[in-house]
Amino acid sequence: MAEPVRLGRKRPLPVCPNPLFVRWLTEWRDEAASRGRHTRFVFQKALRSLQRYPLPLRNGKEAKILQHFGDRLCRMLDERLKEHLASGGDHAPSSPSGKKRASKGPPAQVQGSSMPVPTQPQAGSTNAGYWPAQNSGAREILLQLYREHLNSDGHSFLTKEELLQKCAQKTPRVVPESSRPWPALRGLLHRNLVLRTHRPARYALTPEGLELAQKLAEAEGLSTLNTAFQPEEHHEESPVPEAILSEPGTTEVGVQQRPLELRPSEYRVLLCVDIGETRGAGHRPEMLRELQRLRVPHTVRKLHVGDFVWVAQETRPRDPERPGELVLDHIVERKRLDDLCSSIIDGRFREQKFRLKRCGLGHRIYLVEEHGSVQNLSLPESTLLQAVTNTQVIDGFFVKRTMDIKESAGYLALLTKGLERLYQGHTLHSRPWGTPGDAESEAKPSTNPLCSLLTFSDFNAEAVKNKAQSVREVFARQLMQVRGLSGEKAAALVDRYSTPASLLAAYDACATTKEQEMLLSTVKCGRLQRNLGPALSRTLYQLYCSHSPLT
């Protein structure tokens, strides 16, 4: 006789063996996300790795065996564990079987230490163990919605404008100054703690969010909110930026940041080195060793354009973790001869120069570094010399040639000292992107452009290579793929025909094929206002009007 089929699970799903560590990593990730820091990705990777690990961990040091757990993160877990125990946390260890040990039992000891292991609460749902960090954006949103829920005269919901205005009044620093949609609100929506309805959007607490908000209110001594509710005063001097009021997931737009002023004794000049200069095979890390040997104050960052820039960094910032920084008006692109050859061949050479011209900095330096024998390169020396000469004469860059990496580092050290002397005694001011003083702006330059500078966040954000582009920008990039069509010529073409559709319409309006071929030949290009010429005009006609394969 066949055995009856058993339905359902044979055993319950295993509980999380390290819920305390999961909760703390989640808090750190959400706090980093609410402040727009890239460390949220580090915490997210570590959290995924920990959630896949089936065994309990007694301390942070044991977590080092897991992927994405470094020395610093392990130390953070150990320090948080000590704080938890010092504040009277439960000392009973978690059990792999999920059964709780009797409360009278002796506390377990951490391996190699006399410190007992705290009980880590079991996670029963997706939000189990989630506790927004103190002064974080997520915490303030939940508390503001809880206040509105308890207000008998309210609607139990807030619009986004009302919500963020209240958050800005209560804790101004939790409202980000970046141009991205507020990640704290997006995270709460993802966790199903906040519900969004209607258009324009209304935000209210879900049952899970209400339960968590009540616990947060009790922890902050706000249990009497329902009897002592007072509306927030309106402060006109601290409006919420419009970009923050956009819906989560909308396109990124510029934000008018708070003006930054650095007096002569309030900043230092710091060299920023692109992270690409510290990676890869060969002698790339040697640049950092040379800068350290020469005692050049520097930092390594991801630069979206250029290899070296200088910033005036605030020495006594309000937020030590995010000091104010203004980018000085100098940028360096470093090229070894072998890299110069490859960039000319694959087209990066022209594109990089085009992006450097649009970066907003006025003094552009092209640092060409010798490397090996010229005879071993893929292009003849005359071609390289012509490219470097064009960069200086036509593009207006300052070209500096060095023999090796040591001479390049020495040149950067001299530039750093020179900039320190140049800006000594000057008061520096921030300016928004595209305002007078910007190298890309057509407006009249400001009276003191030397001290009217971009913030580092604006500079790096505008230089992002793969950001969303308009049709005009994509059209210009497409035109630059044609041999002999430089950035200046592409700019002249898109000034007359801003989209491919407008160019095709102009071709359709021509009476004869000859007229179509010569349509673009008289377009004025560059500073000398020379004609584009019949050859390029004919090439572009063939590209956009030929129905057969190009030959």
Swiss-Prot record:
<feature type="binding site">
    <location>
        <position position="333"/>
    </location>
    <ligand>
        <name>Mg(2+) 1</name>
    </ligand>
</feature>
<dbReference type="GO" id="GO:0031573">
    <property type="term" value="P:mitotic intra-S DNA damage checkpoint signaling"/>
</dbReference>
<keyword id="KW-0460">Magnesium</keyword>
<dbReference type="Pfam" id="PF02732">
    <property type="entry name" value="ERCC4"/>
</dbReference>
<dbReference type="GO" id="GO:0004519">
    <property type="term" value="F:endonuclease activity"/>
</dbReference>
<feature type="region of interest" description="Disordered">
    <location>
        <begin position="231"/>
        <end position="255"/>
    </location>
</feature>
<feature type="binding site">
    <location>
        <position position="334"/>
    </location>
    <ligand>
        <name>Mg(2+) 2</name>
    </ligand>
</feature>
<feature type="domain" description="ERCC4">
    <location>
        <begin position="270"/>
        <end position="372"/>
    </location>
</feature>
<comment type="subunit">
    <text>Part of the heterodimeric DNA structure-specific endonuclease complex MUS81-EME1. Part of the heterodimeric DNA structure-specific endonuclease complex MUS81-EME2. Interacts with BLM; may stimulate the endonuclease activity of MUS81. Interacts with SLX4/BTBD12; this interaction is direct and links the MUS81-EME1 complex to SLX4, which may coordinate the action of the structure-specific endonuclease during DNA repair. Interacts with DCLRE1B/Apollo. Interacts with RECQL5; this interaction stimulates mitotic DNA synthesis. Interacts with CHEK2.</text>
</comment>
<dbReference type="GO" id="GO:0033687">
    <property type="term" value="P:osteoblast proliferation"/>
</dbReference>
<dbReference type="InterPro" id="IPR006166">
    <property type="entry name" value="ERCC4_domain"/>
</dbReference>
<keyword id="KW-0479">Metal-binding</keyword>
<dbReference type="GO" id="GO:0006302">
    <property type="term" value="P:double-strand break repair"/>
</dbReference>
<keyword id="KW-0234">DNA repair</keyword>
<feature type="binding site">
    <location>
        <position position="333"/>
    </location>
    <ligand>
        <name>Mg(2+) 2</name>
    </ligand>
</feature>
<dbReference type="InterPro" id="IPR047416">
    <property type="entry name" value="XPF_nuclease_Mus81"/>
</dbReference>
<feature type="binding site">
    <location>
        <position position="307"/>
    </location>
    <ligand>
        <name>Mg(2+) 1</name>
    </ligand>
</feature>
<keyword id="KW-0378">Hydrolase</keyword>
<comment type="function">
    <text>Catalytic subunit of two functionally distinct, structure-specific, heterodimeric DNA endonucleases MUS81-EME1 and MUS81-EME2 that are involved in the maintenance of genome stability. Both endonucleases have essentially the same substrate specificity though MUS81-EME2 is more active than its MUS81-EME1 counterpart. Both cleave 3'-flaps and nicked Holliday junctions, and exhibit limited endonuclease activity with 5' flaps and nicked double-stranded DNAs. MUS81-EME2 which is active during the replication of DNA is more specifically involved in replication fork processing.</text>
</comment>
<dbReference type="GO" id="GO:0031297">
    <property type="term" value="P:replication fork processing"/>
</dbReference>
<dbReference type="GO" id="GO:0048257">
    <property type="term" value="F:3'-flap endonuclease activity"/>
</dbReference>
<keyword id="KW-0597">Phosphoprotein</keyword>
<feature type="binding site">
    <location>
        <position position="277"/>
    </location>
    <ligand>
        <name>Mg(2+) 2</name>
    </ligand>
</feature>
<feature type="region of interest" description="Winged helix domain (WHD); critical for endonuclease activity">
    <location>
        <begin position="131"/>
        <end position="230"/>
    </location>
</feature>
<dbReference type="GO" id="GO:0008821">
    <property type="term" value="F:crossover junction DNA endonuclease activity"/>
</dbReference>
<feature type="active site">
    <location>
        <position position="274"/>
    </location>
</feature>
<comment type="similarity">
    <text>Belongs to the XPF family.</text>
</comment>
<feature type="region of interest" description="Helix-hairpin-helix (2HhH); involved in DNA recognition and bending">
    <location>
        <begin position="471"/>
        <end position="545"/>
    </location>
</feature>
<keyword id="KW-0255">Endonuclease</keyword>
<dbReference type="InterPro" id="IPR027421">
    <property type="entry name" value="DNA_pol_lamdba_lyase_dom_sf"/>
</dbReference>
<dbReference type="Pfam" id="PF21136">
    <property type="entry name" value="MUS81-like_WH"/>
</dbReference>
<dbReference type="Pfam" id="PF21292">
    <property type="entry name" value="EME1-MUS81_C"/>
</dbReference>
<dbReference type="InterPro" id="IPR033309">
    <property type="entry name" value="Mus81"/>
</dbReference>
<dbReference type="InterPro" id="IPR011335">
    <property type="entry name" value="Restrct_endonuc-II-like"/>
</dbReference>
<dbReference type="GO" id="GO:0046872">
    <property type="term" value="F:metal ion binding"/>
</dbReference>
<dbReference type="GO" id="GO:0005634">
    <property type="term" value="C:nucleus"/>
</dbReference>
<dbReference type="InterPro" id="IPR047417">
    <property type="entry name" value="WH_MUS81"/>
</dbReference>
<dbReference type="InterPro" id="IPR042530">
    <property type="entry name" value="EME1/EME2_C"/>
</dbReference>
<feature type="active site">
    <location>
        <position position="277"/>
    </location>
</feature>
<feature type="active site">
    <location>
        <position position="307"/>
    </location>
</feature>
<dbReference type="GO" id="GO:0000727">
    <property type="term" value="P:double-strand break repair via break-induced replication"/>
</dbReference>
<feature type="binding site">
    <location>
        <position position="277"/>
    </location>
    <ligand>
        <name>Mg(2+) 1</name>
    </ligand>
</feature>
